Amino acid sequence: MSTEHFEELNDQQIVRREKMTALAEQGIDPFGKRFERSANSAELKAQYEDKSKEDLEELGQTAIIAGRIMTKRGKGKAGFAHIQDREGQIQIYVRKDDVSEENYEIFKKADLGDFIGVEGDVFKTNVGELSIHARKLTHLSKALRPLPEKFHGLTDIETRYRKRYLDLITNRESFDRFVTRSKIISEIRRYLDGLGFLEVETPVLHNEAGGAAARPFITHHNAQNIDMVLRIATELHLKRLIVGGMERVYEIGRIFRNEGMDATHNPEFTSIEVYQAYADYQDIMDLTEGIIQHTAKAVVGDGPVTYQGTEIAIHEPFKRIHMVDAIKEQTGVDFWQEMSFEEAKALAAEHKVPVEKHHTEVGQIINSFFEEYVEATLIQPTFVYGHPVAVSPLAKKNDEDPRFTDRFELFIMTKEYGNAFTELNDPIDQLERFEAQAKAKELGDDEATGVDYDYIEALEYGMPPTGGLGIGIDRLCMLLTDTTTIRDVLLFPTMK
């Protein structure tokens, strides 16, 4: 508990605590009991919003609702308030003559932020607002702190992230964004389940980081006296399940990478990985396009997705281009030609492309060219395929040109949204690539991984040809909610 709770109470907090004590003295539990509602605000509006004042009087419908008091006005013998539940707000009208004296005292002394239950008649005011004319009030919970910014929501960005509960109470746009996030994840599940995929769970604690190029968080298991890492990907465990015969699997879960934070990166994030036996990267391109298009249709409809003023043709076939061709389009440099590492380094110097100390292969320079010149041009959904072997340690080599792999990444609005490939199922080749990664790690590449011998052993039992995919859920949520920072789609982002 923070020291904030032990600081001197302000006047409002003192008054609210006095009201809490007064409720208890009247035999009313300040923090309430179970309460059964007959409807929420959205259901009432759907049922009665289009009815006239006279129609509602004739119908004589009653309802029982509950929620948080967000506004309150009126003095003397009558008053109005807006009650907020998960679906929105609805107005209540309370008149002293229509409720018990105790009930009216509850209403009079209620503060903004308190929870109440209301039973009454559904009606419309003279200005046409759907409301509940209260016949009975039930106190449900006392708010001991006042809500921020009564009418304008919570505007302080830092507080919105640190105290997400206040953001959700006061900013409906933020609340709805997280409802949409939940729907996005549900629709991805629905799509994959419909294709016969099994959702599975794999360990978060790993003995060896693997499945991605990233720096892990390291922890220690006291009972076993061993260092472990939080997973940087779910890939290697999911492929063990393909070895085990599950054929079509996916996992939606948290991934942890001990790296920098910016508008699109958080150390803890959500990804989905999908693996399909007897498939290749082209099948997985089709699957990826299907997942994205199905989810977009469910969330935003059949039209284009608008992101920061740019229309994304999400329902059109996605463009497909080889990485080497994309580089050639932007720079004129042709990496289809065979060349030495020194020749590639000279091209990099000529085009001001950075070459890292641990770069020892042409493929790494090709990838740097792509990042430097191509990524920023990819606005509409584009599959870039054919990544070099040097930057794709888990992908199968291309049959026609073994310098490259059967791998692709999906780019939208210059950002990577998915990474996929025909999986490497040759244990001898895989071991050689793991060993090359381990060497890069020794040379200072802190994103390179070591050798996972247990995974090699699993491959030695035989894995069928397989296609695999990873999609960043948070970035997809940003795209489909037109949000510019990952913190606005994470309920509790990492804070300093």
Swiss-Prot record:
It is found in: Cytoplasm. SUPFAM superfamilies: Class II aaRS and biotin synthetases, Nucleic acid-binding proteins. Mg(2+) 1 binds at residues 409, 416. It catalyses: tRNA(Lys) + L-lysine + ATP = L-lysyl-tRNA(Lys) + AMP + diphosphate. Binds 3 Mg(2+) ions per subunit. Its EC number is 6.1.1.6. Mg(2+) 2 binds at residue 416. Keywords: Aminoacyl-tRNA synthetase, ATP-binding, Cytoplasm, Ligase, Magnesium, Metal-binding, Nucleotide-binding, Protein biosynthesis. Its cofactor is Mg(2+). The keyword Metal-binding applies. One of its GO terms (molecular function) is tRNA binding. It holds the Pfam family tRNA-synt_2. Signal peptide: none annotated. GO terms for biological process: lysyl-tRNA aminoacylation. GO terms for cellular component: cytosol. InterPro entries: Aa-tRNA-synt_II, aa-tRNA-synth_II, aa-tRNA-synth_II/BPL/LPL, Lys-tRNA-ligase_II, Lys-tRNA-ligase_II_bac/euk, Lys-tRNA-ligase_II_N, Lys-tRNA-synth_II_C, NA-bd_OB-fold. Transmembrane segments: none annotated. Homodimer. Belongs to the class-II aminoacyl-tRNA synthetase family. This is Lysine--tRNA ligase.
